[in-house]
């Protein structure tokens, strides 16, 4: 993220869910999922952000 979009930071908005906000099969209940966005919340970056996550092994 730093190299691709200088000044933009990665934001983790949720990592663990115990309140039932996700589907029953969600990995959030096991602590194995995260919801992420960028600091500028530019939705046009989301596809590339997903690609970067996959390339990083997530």
UniProtKB/Swiss-Prot annotation:
One of its GO terms (biological process) is cell fate specification. Its main location: membrane. This is Indian hedgehog protein. The keyword Ligase does not apply. One of its GO terms (cellular component) is extracellular space. GO terms for molecular function: calcium ion binding; patched binding; peptidase activity. Intercellular signal essential for a variety of patterning events during development.
